[in-house]
Amino acid sequence: SCGDLTFELNHARGETEDATWTWVPERKLLSPGDLFIYAVPNAGNPQKVQRYSGEWAAALRRMAALGAEIMLSGHGLPIFGADRIRVALLDSAELLDSIEAQVLALMNTGCTLDRVIHEVKIPQHLRDKPHLRPVYDDPQFLVRNVWRLYGGWYDGEPDNLLPAPRAEQAREWVDLAGGIDRVLERVATLRDEGNLRMACHLVEYAVIAEPGSKPAHALRAEVYA
């Protein structure tokens, strides 16, 4: 406590195993820390330790039940009003729960990580919420994180258990395509068509197969720009 105010510190597992959120009952003020960031929850950062979508969602639901009238989140502007705060917290929890449930259901049918990534869908009524925009984490990153928690590093593709070096793979694919010029021509076409994901795959093979190719590096820079 501090003066007439009580600061209740609550533990949760979210971005880390030791996240803390704070409740000040006298002011009906909630500080969720990074458990709410006014965007898709940061539960899938590609270069961070394991994160816990299910427990994260549970913490958000606990917060929503408090009836806070002021919320000071770890990122973004304050939110005022009990109804607005409750909706924001429960929407975030629903997103996390939905992704985890879909991933587990698909894993239990024997799907590979690739299939899971592309088959999990965000509920339609959550897609356009201003507090769930994918401005930091893409929902596909969250899918990968749930897979890692329950399925480990193996993606379900047998050829990835003991793979050949990627440089060798790249040279084989470029040779099969008829050489690097053919590959770069196709990359440029894909770029112009707006198929940037596939363009990224092919240009990476080109650069890896011939790392000294200036045209390959130049096109790669354009694709990722």
Predicted regions and their residues:
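Active-site HxH/HxHxD metal-binding segment of metal-dependent hydrolases
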Residues: 1
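Accessory terminal helices/loops
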Residues: 65-69, 78-225
